[in-house]
Amino acid sequence: KMTDKVLLDEWKEDHGIDSDFFKVRVLGQFPDVGSRQLISGSAVREARERELHPSEYDAMPIAIGCDVARFGSDETVILVRQGRRILSLQTYRELDNVQVAMQCAEVYRKYHQASLFVDEVGLGSGVVDTLKSLNYPVVGVNAGRSPEDKTRFFNLRAEMWYRMKEWCESGVDIIDDNVLCEQLASIEYGYSPTEQVKIEKKEDMRKRGLSSPDRAEALALTFAYIIPPQQMQGSFEADDYL
């Protein structure tokens, strides 16, 4: 349609054909590997194409991550990861805190002895409170808090995302989801004045024409805290239970 061509021409003029916006929105490509790109497009593509045998992950602990929508255009996402494989990803819009909590509870009941991590910043605090009132063993995650490695990372969000980066590069099997893959390959990083790793803010991603990385954030939440090895069956190296 002519209107589509006009819109594409406007995007070309406003953002440029080499911009992340144009590559993701128009060409359906991952951004090129750049000096500020946290997770390479090639690592994401390989993880998307890989299929692990159940024996490679079914004895590993299960982690559930819930990123709660903050704005109308954002998604609430519940993602389930078992070791090196993503088991499921569900997205929702326009749910209140109680409804989100009920969805989390339903997913939790499906998986035995899973660890449940919920973003407790903003509206997420109500979800965490509701789950706690129902006696679910939820862990509220405030990504702005101090990380375990305070020398290397600016905050917990940077630490979570970097753990996820290392996981993505370790022979994993991620779900075949275009939006998740685009979000993983689009995030950028930098350094604080004290040389700590910082992850790009959602507001800065929007300035680049990209949407809030809600699905990737849900995956990152599963790396908020290392799951104790006593929750695993069999013998594994320390890196295996991230």
Where are these regions (language model features)?
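Short, flexible loop/turn motifs enriched in small residues
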Residues: 59, 70-77
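Mg2+-dependent endonuclease catalytic cores in nucleic-acid-processing enzymes, primarily RNase H-like
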Residues: 84-197, 236-242
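Well-ordered alpha-helical segments embedded in enzymatic catalytic cores
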Residues: 77, 99-103, 217
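Acidic active-site catalytic centers that drive phospho-/nucleotidyl reactions
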Residues: 67, 119, 214-217
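Short conserved beta-strand segments at catalytic cores or DNA/RNA-binding microdomains
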Residues: 77-83
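ATPase catalytic-site recognition across NTP-hydrolyzing enzymes
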Residues: 1-66, 80
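Acidic, Mg2+-coordinating catalytic module of metal-dependent nucleases/exonucleases
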Residues: 202-228
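Enriched but not universal
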Residues: 208, 229-242
